[in-house]
Amino acid sequence: MTGKRGTAAGTDGSGNKKGKREFKAKLSGLLAEQTCRDSVKEAWEGNQGGQFGSVALDSVPFPHGVIHPFIHNSDFLEELKEELLNLNFQPKSNDLYQFKQSEDLKNRKESHIKALRHVLFEDFRQWLSNITNVELEKTVDISCAQYGYTDTLLCHDDELEGRRFAFILYLVPEWSKSDGGSLDLYGMDDNGQPGPIVKSLVPRWNSLVFFEVSPVSFHQVSEVLSDGKCRLSVSGWFHGCSLERPPRGLDHPPVRSPHIPHDDQILYEWINPSYLSLESQAQIQEEFEERSEILLKDFLKADKFQAICAALETQSITLEKCGPPNKRCYDRAHGDFPGVIGSCMELLRSEAFFLFLSNFTGLKLHFLASNNEESDEGEGPSEPNTVSQQGASSEDDKVPSCSGELRHWQHSYYTMIHDLDPERHEFALDLLLFCGCDDWEAEYGGFTSYIAKEEDEELLTVYPENNCLALVYRDKETMRFVKHINHKSQQRDAKNTKHKGFWDFAFVYYE
C-alpha cells in the first residue's frame, strides 16, 4: 500500500533520522479524583445507580457503567481514529452478527493504538479492579469494529471462559437514536432467558461503556439505520475468574406427530402434476440422493397457491412472537387455521405426502417406502408407492413423524444456532414452502443458511421464492439459521401495501 506523505516516516523534514515519537493517553482527570473513585466504589458495591463525576452507574438490568469523557485529550482520539481506519478490516457475517472487524490489536505497533492499549490494560484496569473489588489479569483482549448500514450484533451474553468485564470505547460522529447502533441491554424472564430490552445506550464520542460478564448480561448492538455514518468502536474484555453459571434450561422440543390418514387424491388436488409422474420422481430422487437437497419450483397448483396467498393477506391469523431473543425472533401462526391454509397444513401432514416425500428422497418416511438397499439390486426405476397399496409395517419399525409451523418473517426477524437446540442432534428432512416473497432480494436477509458444525462457511443457502418447495436432508453435524432481515427490506415493504415480509410453511420430517 502506498500513499502521498509530506516526509518519510522516521525522518525530519531534511530527511535525517529522528527519534520515534511516543504518545501517551491519559484518562479523564475526573476518574483520578479520590472522591469520585470512592463514590463509584461505594455505589458499585451497593448495587446503586447514579452520576459520579464522569461516571454514570446503573444496576438495571445488570450492573454497568458509562464514562464520559473517558480520554482526557480528544485530539489524541482523532489521531487514534485515523490509525484505526488505516487497518485492514474483514467483513464478518454469520447467524449472530454482521460487521467489519480489524485484526487483533494486541501487538499493533502504531503509536496511538499502543498508547490506548496501555491506558486500557494498565491504568483503567487498575481503576476498574479497585472499584469492583475484582482482581483482573493483564491479559490483552482488544479489537476494533466498524458497523455500517444494516450491520448488527444480535442478542448474546459474552460468555467465554475467563471474560470478567466487557468494555466498548466509541469513536463515532454525532449520533442519535434514529441512527440505530445502540447498545441494548436485556432484562430476564421467569425462565432465566433474556426478555425485553430494558435500556438502550446511544454511542457517543469518547464515551466508554463497561459491564460485568455474567449469566444475565444479555445485550445487542441494534441494527445501524444510517446509510452515511460509521459506528467505529474499540472493544474487548478484562479477564479474571469467571462467575459461576447456573445450568441452562433446555428448549422444549417441537411436538411431533405421525401422519394423518389421507389417500392419494389430496396430492392430485394440490400438487403440480409434473411432480407426480414416475419419470419426474425418479429424476428428483436421483438428484436429491446425490446432493441431499433440491428446490422444486411451482410446486403447488397455481390456483391453490394463489388461494393461500390471498388468505394470508386477508384472513385474520393469530400470531405469537417466538423467542427468546438469544435464539430466535419471528411470528408463529397459532390456533386454528382457516380454510385453505388449514388444508395446506393438512396436506403436509398427510399419509399420502409422507409417502410422496419418500418417493422423492429415498428416505423411509412410510412403511410402504422402498428400501434403497433392496431397490438398488433391481434394474431401472420402480413404480412409485401409493397409500392404496396393501402392506403392513414391522413392529420394530420406528414410526415416521413430523413437526411443522406456519411462520411470518419481517424486518428484524431471525433465528440463531444454539447449543441446546433439541433438533440439532438428529438426522432430519427439512421442508420449506414460501409464500408472499414477491420482489424479495437476497440482500434483505431472511434466507436459510446451512453450515457444518464448528465452521462458518455455508454449505447451502435457501432463498425465499414464491411457490418453491425446498427439501434439505441434514445430518447431526449440520446446523441451520435464518439470516437477520435488515432495514433494506422496508424499501420493498413500502411499495407493497398488502403485506409486510413473507411467510413460510416450515416442516421437519423424521424417519
Swiss-Prot record:
<dbReference type="InterPro" id="IPR039558">
    <property type="entry name" value="TPA1/OFD1_N"/>
</dbReference>
<dbReference type="GO" id="GO:0005737">
    <property type="term" value="C:cytoplasm"/>
</dbReference>
<protein>
    <recommendedName>
        <fullName>Prolyl 3-hydroxylase OGFOD1</fullName>
        <ecNumber>1.14.11.-</ecNumber>
    </recommendedName>
</protein>
<dbReference type="GO" id="GO:0031543">
    <property type="term" value="F:peptidyl-proline dioxygenase activity"/>
</dbReference>
<keyword id="KW-0479">Metal-binding</keyword>
<dbReference type="InterPro" id="IPR051842">
    <property type="entry name" value="uS12_prolyl_hydroxylase"/>
</dbReference>
<dbReference type="GO" id="GO:0031544">
    <property type="term" value="F:peptidyl-proline 3-dioxygenase activity"/>
</dbReference>
<keyword id="KW-0963">Cytoplasm</keyword>
<dbReference type="GO" id="GO:0005634">
    <property type="term" value="C:nucleus"/>
</dbReference>
<feature type="domain" description="Fe2OG dioxygenase">
    <location>
        <begin position="138"/>
        <end position="240"/>
    </location>
</feature>
<feature type="binding site">
    <location>
        <position position="231"/>
    </location>
    <ligand>
        <name>2-oxoglutarate</name>
    </ligand>
</feature>
<dbReference type="InterPro" id="IPR005123">
    <property type="entry name" value="Oxoglu/Fe-dep_dioxygenase_dom"/>
</dbReference>
<dbReference type="GO" id="GO:0006449">
    <property type="term" value="P:regulation of translational termination"/>
</dbReference>
<feature type="region of interest" description="Disordered">
    <location>
        <begin position="372"/>
        <end position="403"/>
    </location>
</feature>
<dbReference type="Pfam" id="PF10637">
    <property type="entry name" value="Ofd1_CTDD"/>
</dbReference>
<keyword id="KW-0408">Iron</keyword>
<dbReference type="Pfam" id="PF13661">
    <property type="entry name" value="2OG-FeII_Oxy_4"/>
</dbReference>
<keyword id="KW-0539">Nucleus</keyword>
<feature type="binding site">
    <location>
        <position position="156"/>
    </location>
    <ligand>
        <name>Fe cation</name>
    </ligand>
</feature>
<feature type="region of interest" description="Disordered">
    <location>
        <begin position="1"/>
        <end position="20"/>
    </location>
</feature>
<feature type="binding site">
    <location>
        <position position="219"/>
    </location>
    <ligand>
        <name>Fe cation</name>
    </ligand>
</feature>
<dbReference type="InterPro" id="IPR006620">
    <property type="entry name" value="Pro_4_hyd_alph"/>
</dbReference>
<dbReference type="GO" id="GO:0034063">
    <property type="term" value="P:stress granule assembly"/>
</dbReference>
<dbReference type="GO" id="GO:0031418">
    <property type="term" value="F:L-ascorbic acid binding"/>
</dbReference>
<comment type="function">
    <text>Prolyl 3-hydroxylase that catalyzes 3-hydroxylation of 'Pro-62' of small ribosomal subunit uS12 (rps23), thereby regulating protein translation termination efficiency. Involved in stress granule formation.</text>
</comment>
<feature type="binding site">
    <location>
        <position position="170"/>
    </location>
    <ligand>
        <name>2-oxoglutarate</name>
    </ligand>
</feature>
<dbReference type="GO" id="GO:0018126">
    <property type="term" value="P:protein hydroxylation"/>
</dbReference>
<comment type="subunit">
    <text>Monomer.</text>
</comment>
<dbReference type="GO" id="GO:0008283">
    <property type="term" value="P:cell population proliferation"/>
</dbReference>
<dbReference type="GO" id="GO:0005506">
    <property type="term" value="F:iron ion binding"/>
</dbReference>
<feature type="binding site">
    <location>
        <position position="158"/>
    </location>
    <ligand>
        <name>Fe cation</name>
    </ligand>
</feature>
<keyword id="KW-0560">Oxidoreductase</keyword>
<dbReference type="InterPro" id="IPR019601">
    <property type="entry name" value="Oxoglutarate/Fe-dep_Oase_C"/>
</dbReference>
<dbReference type="GO" id="GO:0010494">
    <property type="term" value="C:cytoplasmic stress granule"/>
</dbReference>
<comment type="similarity">
    <text>Belongs to the TPA1 family.</text>
</comment>
<keyword id="KW-0847">Vitamin C</keyword>
<keyword id="KW-0223">Dioxygenase</keyword>
